[in-house]
């Protein structure tokens, strides 16, 4: 059972990585047989991975058309960004009340790992740690029913960000942007944490002033 779960997790992670990095592009058709050969796993493992990716909003499965990578619709991206902003801000006060010293130590370690990924130029690794960081804070609020929605929002944010290379920050800056969030959480200041998270989401893509005004 453990080996089967490891194979499923590995296949899911591999396909997700290719979608996020735009190696599998919007509209691409994915076949279970083809992916099974590429990933050296069973079609059943691929099928389960695609179901998880559908829950993430990264693929859509249709009986007669197969499985396709979802589009990156700018309007949908903006809606998901706003939804993410609201979910994280809503969780902030509860998280600030419940965070423990052990929780903070784990988040400090995540921040250090983000710094290391940035220094190594590992953009995808940094994005994966970013998800871990935000979910670790969100889970303190114990709003389990909203977690899958938040994951979907964050993954879509990452895809959109990687599609806007002109507005991407240096990786070191991306990592450092999490420090004000961590500081507010360490102070158990729910209002400050909500503001820090809202600012973080609002400024994920570093848009040029002329484009902000348009």
Regions found by a protein language model. Name each.
Residues 1-97, 102, 135, 139, ...:
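Short linear motifs at protein or domain termini
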Residues 80, 101-162, 176-184, 192-203:
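Conserved amphipathic alpha-helical segments that form helical-bundle/coiled-coil interaction surfaces
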């Amino acid at each position: 059972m453990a080996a089967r779960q490891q194979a499923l997790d590995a296949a899911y992670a591999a396909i997700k990585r290719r979608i996020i990095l735009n190696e599998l592009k919007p509209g691409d058709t994915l076949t279970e047989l083809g992916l099974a050969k590429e990933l050296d796993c069973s079609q059943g493992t691929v099928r389960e991975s695609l179901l998880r990716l559908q829950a993430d909003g990264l693929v859509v499965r249709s009986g007669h058309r197969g499985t396709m990578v979802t589009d990156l619709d700018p309007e949908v991206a903006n809606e998901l960004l706003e939804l993410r902003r609201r979910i994280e801000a809503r969780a902030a006060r509860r998280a600030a009340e419940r965070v423990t010293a052990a929780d903070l130590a784990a988040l400090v370690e995540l921040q250090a790992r983000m710094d290391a990924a940035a220094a190594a130029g590992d953009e995808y690794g940094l994005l994966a740690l970013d998800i871990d960081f935000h979910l670790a804070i969100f889970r303190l609020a114990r709003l389990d029913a909203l977690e899958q929605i938040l994951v979907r929002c964050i993954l879509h944010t990452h895809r959109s960000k990687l599609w806007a290379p002109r507005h991407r920050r240096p990786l070191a800056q991306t990592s450092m942007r999490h420090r004000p969030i961590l500081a507010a959480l360490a102070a158990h200041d729910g209002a400050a944490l909500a503001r820090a998270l809202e600012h973080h989401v609002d400024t994920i893509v570093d848009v040029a002033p002329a484009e902000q005004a348009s």
